[in-house]
A protein has these predicted regions:
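Hydrophobic, membrane-embedded alpha-helices of multi-pass small-molecule transporters
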Residues: 1, 47-51, 55, 118-123, ...
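Hydrophobic alpha-helical segments and their helix-loop junctions in multi-pass secondary transporters
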Residues: 48, 85, 89, 107-133, ...
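Membrane-interface helix termini and inter-helical loops of multi-pass transporters
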Residues: 61-69, 121-137, 202-204
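Small-residue-rich segments of transmembrane alpha-helices in multi-pass membrane proteins
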Residues: 33-43, 104-120, 182-193
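Membrane-interface loop-to-helix entry segments
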Residues: 62-63, 75-76, 88-119
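Extracellular/periplasmic helix-exit of transmembrane alpha-helices
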Residues: 11-17, 148-149, 183-204
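Juxtamembrane transmembrane-helix boundary signature
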Residues: 2-31
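Transmembrane-helix boundary/entry motifs in multi-pass membrane transporters
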Residues: 20-51, 68-74
Length: 204
């Protein structure tokens, strides 16, 4: 988790600084600057694919949530998410940033609260340790897992972090933003990990 947090801070700072230097309005100038025209164009396709995949998962997840929590048809949840997404995008880049600024702290706070409740209601530590020892190892290489986690989170974020860096006034703001954002994501990751670690036996 510490490695993930450091990498979030580092790559977030690099991407926003490039966006500030290159005066970008999209991710394309950044990936071309880093990888050249050929690799940059390929990266553009990859980022677009990741964004489309994330959008599809988000819409499907909203449908599943509406069905599970409210016993409504999944299509209603998907249509609701599509409507909110379209309205947000039509509002421009500032509208997207405002929505992220509202949702992201709420998600991190929710993860922390769930983790705290899980810790307070968990069995004694000795029982947890015993159950973990008897449990098969899910990921054997923590470094490789950290790199993969960072990769699929950072790649689609370039399209937001680049233009966001362009709107900042100096490197100090970029540095502070990357630091706070990385720490926040690290706290969220730690909270999720602790919850899954303790409740792994109940996950099916």
């Amino acid at each position: 988790i510490f490695t993930v947090t450091v990498l979030f801070i580092y790559f977030g700072y690099i991407i926003m600084e490039l966006g500030w230097k290159l005066n970008v309005s999209s991710h394309l100038p950044i990936v071309r600057e880093v990888g050249g025209r050929l690799i940059g164009n390929f990266s553009d396709v990859v980022i677009t694919f990741f964004l489309f995949g994330a959008l599809t998962a988000m819409i499907a997840g909203a449908g599943a949530l509406f069905h599970q929590e409210f016993d409504l048809h999944p299509l209603l949840g998907s249509l609701f998410m599509v409507t909110v997404t379209v309205i947000t995008v039509l509002g421009g880049f500032n509208s997207i940033i405002n929505s992220i600024s509202f949702v992201a702290p709420f998600l991190v706070l929710s993860a922390v609260i769930v983790s705290i409740v899980t810790l307070l209601t968990a069995p004694p530590l000795s029982q947890i340790e015993q159950s973990v020892i008897e449990r098969p190892v899910m990921l054997r290489n923590w470094l490789w897992a950290s790199i993969l986690y960072i990769s699929y989170n950072i790649i689609p974020s370039i399209s937001i972090l680049g233009p966001l860096g362009n709107q900042t006034q100096n490197r100090k703001i970029i540095r502070n933003g990357a630091l706070l954002g990385g720490i926040g994501l690290g706290i969220g990751a730690a909270a999720i990990y602790l919850t899954l670690y303790i409740k792994a036996d109940s996950i099916k």
